[in-house]
A protein has these predicted regions:
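Mg2+/Mn2+-dependent nuclease catalytic core
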Residues: 101-181
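Nuclease catalytic cores
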Residues: 1-108, 112
């Protein structure tokens, strides 16, 4: 639903602006991506294990990262865990039904994804789908333009993209079960 990111074209432009090589820019992006996915995976593992009453061991999860990135994760992860603990403490009305739930539609859309948490809201007496995000940015709009049809009235920002994602998951649950989200 959005324009594909042309990594080489963008890296060429960034390299020229920063007076470095395209390879250096791509390597920097790869390391940043590895850092982000490692941090996100570790937080998601913590949350999943928290709801399953399991202890989390984080050793060995730093493959491919340098010392600085590992240190940054060790500093950032406790902060993110604190945010999750605050969320949990502030939302005792949300009871975990299932973590890491796979949702998909093999007959029509051929789309599949995974949500972090399916919970029951005791206040509204309804199910809710939650997905925890660790993005660097969480914007509603972006300078990169609008999404493609049928979302062409929405900007390409992370908030809009994740809103669509959760609504697609909602559609799957309601299509294939008797549950309402």
């Amino acid at each position: 639903f959005k324009k594909e990111f042309d990594q080489h074209k963008t890296a060429t432009r960034v390299a020229k602006r920063m007076k470095t090589t395209v390879e250096a820019v791509l390597a920097d992006w790869a390391l940043g991506n590895l850092y982000s996915t490692t941090l996100g995976s570790m937080l998601h593992k913590y949350i999943d294990n928290f709801y399953c009453n399991k202890r989390v061991e984080f050793e060995g999860n730093f493959v491919g990262l340098g010392f600085d990135e590992k240190q940054k994760i060790l500093e950032t992860l406790p902060v993110l865990i604190g945010y999750f603990q605050n969320f949990y403490n502030d939302n005792k009305h949300l009871l975990c039904v299932k973590t890491e739930i796979v949702l998909g539609d093999i007959s029509d859309t051929k789309i599949c994804g995974m949500s972090d948490l399916l919970c029951y809201n005791t206040d509204t007496e309804q199910l809710e789908i939650l997905d925890f995000k660790t993005n660097k940015r969480m914007e509603k709009s972006s300078p990169y333009g609008d999404l493609f049809y049928p979302f062409d009235d929405m900007s390409e920002g992370e908030i809009n993209e994740y809103t669509i994602q959760l609504n697609v998951y909602k559609y799957f649950v309601e299509k294939y079960t008797t549950c309402e989200i």
